[in-house]
Regions:
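Helix-to-loop junctions at the C-terminal end of transmembrane segments
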Residues: 26-40, 125, 220-234, 315
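Helix-loop boundary and gating motifs at the non-cytosolic
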Residues: 1-25, 169-214
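C-terminal ends and interior cores of transmembrane alpha-helices
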Residues: 49-63, 241-253
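Hydrophobic core of transmembrane alpha-helices in multi-pass small-molecule transporters
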Residues: 65-81, 183, 258-271
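C-terminal transmembrane helical hairpin of 12-TM major facilitator-type secondary transporters
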Residues: 234-276
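A membrane-interface helix-boundary motif in multi-pass transporters
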Residues: 126-139, 313-331
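Cytoplasmic helix-loop-helix junction between adjacent transmembrane helices
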Residues: 72-112
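A late C-terminal transmembrane helix in Major Facilitator Superfamily
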Residues: 287-320
Length: 348
């Protein structure tokens, strides 16, 4: 919104957003690995400061489009690796079966962020200024990072320095499965977003409520099922629920029934991610967990970009219904990945 308002170009705005995603996807595994190498304090504080300053620069500095893209890349590359840090520390905080409940809470909180964040940013941009969400984001990044570090002191957490080569964790079958499944699942979600927005056209409120229905379904699914041991079949069934609800949404008429279908599709989203995170946490050595979760974050970002790109192309070439079916196909692809992986042996 901010870049489009400044430049008058949606193409430039999209390019800046793409550069931000690329920057985060490329850098996150590396910054996550630094957590064990140089420590949480210097890694997180330096990243938060660079990220905050970069967002302030994007908010106030008038520069050509090329420099805006560079700023976007820097913003993405400097995102503090808080998610990998927190998820690597969970086993130290809650042992045993409590870990599932904690990851379920994690994915539920993530759903709240995905629902509230875009709405809040859009409201602030339209009500006050497009620069305000960037200022708010910079403040949240810096204050939130400091708050996390101060809160973590009472647990005396430690992230072990990795003793293996960078990227070697990608050879682990649990990480491969987790990246493939989460990439396809997130791609399904972002493609569905494109389909919903295209289906309801200029009815922004209807589209917003429809997307919120998916988020609420995922939120409830995380609370009710995220703490349970799913197993391979359960994980596949959870992701198949996302696919089935998406297909139903594309086939039914009537706004109320469509909302119900989207709600049903969301029920499997958070439990699936929670199960994936628990699997990685259990199967990866302590010195590699932060890097592994950094790669998972990158995979999710790539999946989101793929889903959005495919959705846009399919909408232009065919119809909103076609995008919704593509979204369902991506979710079904995610659902079969655990079954395929199991044929090669247990993966956790």
């Amino acid at each position: 919104l901010h870049v489009q308002a400044r430049t008058g170009s949606y193409a430039v705005a999209g390019a800046v957003v793409a550069c931000t995603s690329i920057g985060e996807a490329v850098a996150m595994p590396m910054t996550a690995r630094l957590l064990g190498r140089i420590g949480m304090m210097p890694t997180l504080v330096s990243a938060a400061l660079i990220n905050g300053v970069s967002m302030l620069a994007l908010a106030f500095i008038h520069v050509p489009a090329t420099f805006l893209m560079v700023l976007g890349f820097l913003i993405g590359a400097s995102v503090p690796p808080l998610l990998p840090a927190v998820r690597a520390l969970y086993p130290q905080m809650v042992p045993g079966q409590g870990l599932r409940a904690l990851f379920a809470l994690d994915t539920t909180a993530q759903e709240l962020i995905w629902v509230i964040g875009p709405v809040a940013a859009t409201f602030l941009a339209s009500a006050i200024s497009t620069a305000i969400p960037l200022l708010f984001s910079a403040a949240v990044t810096i204050v939130g990072t400091v708050w996390f570090l101060l809160s973590a002191r009472q647990f005396r957490p430690t992230i072990v320095s990795s003793t293996v080569a960078f990227g070697k964790v990608l050879a682990n079958r649990a990480v491969i499965l987790a990246m493939a499944a989460s990439l396809a699942l997130v791609a399904s979600f972002t493609a569905l977003e494109v389909g919903v927005l295209a289906l309801y056209g200029n009815h922004n409120l209807s589209a917003g409520i429809a997307l919120a229905a998916t988020g609420v379904g995922s939120l409830l699914g995380g609370v009710l099922f995220g703490h349970r041991h799913l197993g391979v079949r359960g994980l596949s069934l959870s992701m198949a629920t996302v696919a089935a609800g998406t297909v139903l949404f594309g086939l039914v008429d009537g706004y109320g029934v469509q909302l119900a279908a989207l709600f049903a599709s969301g029920l499997g989203f958070a439990p699936s991610l929670a199960a994936i995170y628990v699997m990685v946490s259990n199967q990866i050595a302590a010195h590699s967990t932060a890097e592994a979760f950094g790669w998972l974050n990158s995979g999710a970002l790539v999946g989101g970009a793929i889903g959005t790109a495919i959705g846009g192309v399919v909408v232009d070439a065919y119809s909103p219904f076609a995008v919704i079916m593509v979204s369902a196909a991506l979710a079904m692809t995610a659902a079969i990945t655990p079954l395929i992986a199991r044929t090669a042996g247990p993966v956790g």
